[in-house]
Amino acid sequence: MDIFDAIVLGIIQGLTEFLPVSSSGHLELGKAILGDTSLPEESLLFTVVLHFATALSTLVVFRKDVFEIFSGLLKFKWNEETQFSLKIIISMLPAVIVGLLFEEQLEALFGGNILFVGFMLLITALLLWLADKAKDTGKKVSYRNAFIIGVSQAIAMLPGISRSGATISTSVLLGNDKTKAARFSFLMVVPLIFGKIAKDLMSGELMASSTDFSILATGFIAAFLAGLVACTWMISLVKKSKLSWFAIYCFVVGLAAIIFAYAQ
């Protein structure tokens, strides 16, 4: 991997972490079209660095919210910040359970299945289209909604289902305010990213990585900057009901994937 590869992969990670296009689905499509060996090899350490960069970009964009949450928690009272934190924890449970118990099985079943990815992208397109047409409200995410949104995040482990698309769409379709839905969606994944990073660090596999520091630094900066742009842009798009743009994109790519699968 060279500097150019690091920049490209960093930008892709930064954009697809927030834009509702399914990074896992695009990765599977890229492998199918280019072949596994045509893609640059990513070390585990490089992947961890990119995820850390996007998590950090989320914290920067929502720095005011994060500060208020921690300030509220330090008061040790049953306040709005404590309730929001509990909702985040509830939303994490389905993905944690599925990730710990079924991640390898899901990869074995659906990894490389382009036809499946195509149909999942069509589902993502439908969710985004429906959410885009939903009326905006002032409703906050409830505890029940937090769990349902968490279930949609767990389902988004399937290649082709966008995590941000599934969680934001589910939240909006449950009647929640669009801006609050985007905020909840992006904040709920941060603890999971840090948890995954901690798991990888404890595995000891990172010690075997030989990735050059300049590659890591370049990838980090690219992912961080792309993440800042994508996260801010996505919030604006949700506010302005522009999710239909991504619905059309996912529909076209999903249809192309299905045609490609049958043509093989």
Curated annotation (Swiss-Prot):
Major localisation: membrane
Pfam families the UniProt entry points to: BacA (PF02673)
EC number: 3.6.1.27
Catalytic activity: di-trans,octa-cis-undecaprenyl diphosphate + H2O = di-trans,octa-cis-undecaprenyl phosphate + phosphate + H(+)
GO biological process, one term: peptidoglycan biosynthetic process
Name this protein carries in UniProt: Undecaprenyl-diphosphatase
Transmembrane segments: 42-62, 82-102, 109-129, 146-166, 184-204, 215-235, 243-263
Protein's job: Catalyzes the dephosphorylation of undecaprenyl diphosphate (UPP). Confers resistance to bacitracin.
Entry keywords, A to Z: Antibiotic resistance, Cell membrane, Cell shape, Cell wall biogenesis/degradation, Hydrolase, Membrane, Peptidoglycan synthesis, Transmembrane, Transmembrane helix
InterPro entries associated with the record: UppP
Topology class, membrane: Multi-pass membrane protein
Localization in the cell: Cell membrane
More about this protein: Bacitracin is thought to be involved in the inhibition of peptidoglycan synthesis by sequestering undecaprenyl diphosphate, thereby reducing the pool of lipid carrier available.
Domain of life: Bacteria
GO cellular component assignments: plasma membrane
GO molecular function terms noted in the UniProt entry: undecaprenyl-diphosphatase activity
Organism field: Christiangramia forsetii (strain DSM 17595 / CGMCC 1.15422 / KT0803)
UniProt family annotation: Belongs to the UppP family.
